[in-house]
Amino acid sequence: TGYPRNDVLFAKNNEKDITDIKKKLGISPEKKVIMYAPTWRVRNQFNMKIDIQELKKQIQDDYVLMLRIHPFAVKGLKEDLLDEFVINVSNYPSVEELYLASDIVITDYSSVMFDYAILNRPMLFFTYDLEDYRDTLRGFNFDFVAEAPGPLLKTSDEVIQSIVNIDKVAQEHDEALQKFRKKFCEYEKGTASEQIFQRVMQNQ
């Protein structure tokens, strides 16, 4: 049936609802939005590896950057990183609304990729510690390198340049994204809650 929590990604995927979400977040409707949502790495707190000042210099006229940090790692987020360009949404109650507000997601190995793929929007994978994560920390339960629905980027500069050239990057990785969606999002139709309700009622 898909996941009931993801039904909202269909129901609210429209200009009015997205504008309303941006207003709740304090983001201008005119701005495009990037969300950086890295996974928890077990042994460390959050450590910003993206050169925020360089990113800001390149894209601040057009974008806002939202940081969605894992609860176990958010203590490592330095308050002096935050300003009108960088906002902390780690405690925002609905990650689904954050997905809807985001034009691009930057992640790494997080399950964010499976839900955000439903929206068919670009994803960038900042995998600066790929070998360590795969071989030492947590590993993968699918062939991440072969099946990732976006580019695997090792450096901050690669991330920034991918954002600057996002239309080209998205086009180059669209085939991978569509394969990923077909494999992992097949049952996501926006009707999971209704399907489950109907099945429960049939069994009464």
Enumerate the language-model features and the residues they cover:
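Catalytic binding pocket for nucleotide-activated donors in carbohydrate/polymer assembly enzymes
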Residues: 84, 111-184
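Donor nucleotide-activated moiety binding/catalytic core segment of transferases
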Residues: 71-114
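Short, acidic/turn-prone active-site loops that include or flank metal/cofactor-
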Residues: 3-6, 91-94, 128-132
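Short, well-ordered alpha-helix to beta-strand connector turns
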Residues: 62-63, 85, 102, 120
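C-terminal alpha-helical cap of glycosyltransferases
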Residues: 188-204
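Generic beta-sheet signal
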Residues: 1, 68, 126-128
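Hydrophobic residues at beta-strand termini and immediately following loops
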Residues: 1, 89, 153
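Conserved catalytic-core segment of nucleotide-activated headgroup transferases in glycan assembly
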Residues: 5-79, 153-155, 185, 192-194
